[in-house]
Amino acid sequence: MKLLEEFIQEKGTVLPGNVLKVDAFLNHQIDPVLMQAMGNEFAKRFQDLGITKIVTIESSGIAPAVFAGLALSVPVVFARKKKSVTLTDNLFTSTVYSYTKKESNDISVSKQFLTVDDTILVIDDFLANGQAALGLLEIAEHAGAKVAGIGIVIEKSFQQGRELLNKTGIPVYSLARIASLENEEILFLEEE
């Protein structure tokens, strides 16, 4: 998606350890015009798959997921990383490792919001090692829900995440695919 690539080039920053900082439009400050365009792009890609719910992880996946949900007219469910007083039992859970934060988190979704009747689109902000998406797939499996597709905002194609997700047989679509972050230069793969 050319618009997203332009945002990444103009406002993204490469940090040591192959980390791409995109807090100017996605991870801290959110650009709603970009989010709407991304939501529409995800909807266009997945509109014929009978999606009934979108599932993501808090917090940076929420904005693109909500705009995709708006475009598809379906609810959005986000997995929580921290338990709250209102989210204590009757949960589907999985443990995921964060590449950026270098820590594991238990993620949870209330059993009330995912069922065997759901056809899910998973949306996540980044695909690096694939752990967040795999955790969401595990939660969907616990619920007995069908995962029809995985939408990624920014994929680091030089890491193993895409390969792991491809092994699931579930279609994966990334809006921006990064080939390299070497020498603080952002190089993209061609669009899918």
Swiss-Prot record:
<dbReference type="GO" id="GO:0046110">
    <property type="term" value="P:xanthine metabolic process"/>
</dbReference>
<dbReference type="GO" id="GO:0005737">
    <property type="term" value="C:cytoplasm"/>
</dbReference>
<comment type="pathway">
    <text>Purine metabolism; XMP biosynthesis via salvage pathway; XMP from xanthine: step 1/1.</text>
</comment>
<keyword id="KW-0660">Purine salvage</keyword>
<comment type="similarity">
    <text>Belongs to the purine/pyrimidine phosphoribosyltransferase family. Xpt subfamily.</text>
</comment>
<dbReference type="InterPro" id="IPR010079">
    <property type="entry name" value="Xanthine_PRibTrfase"/>
</dbReference>
<keyword id="KW-0808">Transferase</keyword>
<feature type="binding site">
    <location>
        <position position="20"/>
    </location>
    <ligand>
        <name>xanthine</name>
    </ligand>
</feature>
<dbReference type="Pfam" id="PF00156">
    <property type="entry name" value="Pribosyltran"/>
</dbReference>
<dbReference type="InterPro" id="IPR050118">
    <property type="entry name" value="Pur/Pyrimidine_PRTase"/>
</dbReference>
<dbReference type="InterPro" id="IPR000836">
    <property type="entry name" value="PRibTrfase_dom"/>
</dbReference>
<feature type="binding site">
    <location>
        <position position="156"/>
    </location>
    <ligand>
        <name>xanthine</name>
    </ligand>
</feature>
<feature type="binding site">
    <location>
        <begin position="128"/>
        <end position="132"/>
    </location>
    <ligand>
        <name>5-phospho-alpha-D-ribose 1-diphosphate</name>
    </ligand>
</feature>
<dbReference type="GO" id="GO:0000310">
    <property type="term" value="F:xanthine phosphoribosyltransferase activity"/>
</dbReference>
<dbReference type="InterPro" id="IPR029057">
    <property type="entry name" value="PRTase-like"/>
</dbReference>
<feature type="binding site">
    <location>
        <position position="27"/>
    </location>
    <ligand>
        <name>xanthine</name>
    </ligand>
</feature>
<keyword id="KW-0963">Cytoplasm</keyword>
<dbReference type="GO" id="GO:0032265">
    <property type="term" value="P:XMP salvage"/>
</dbReference>
<protein>
    <recommendedName>
        <fullName>Xanthine phosphoribosyltransferase</fullName>
        <ecNumber>2.4.2.22</ecNumber>
    </recommendedName>
</protein>
<comment type="subunit">
    <text>Homodimer.</text>
</comment>
<comment type="function">
    <text>Converts the preformed base xanthine, a product of nucleic acid breakdown, to xanthosine 5'-monophosphate (XMP), so it can be reused for RNA or DNA synthesis.</text>
</comment>
<dbReference type="GO" id="GO:0006166">
    <property type="term" value="P:purine ribonucleoside salvage"/>
</dbReference>
<keyword id="KW-0328">Glycosyltransferase</keyword>
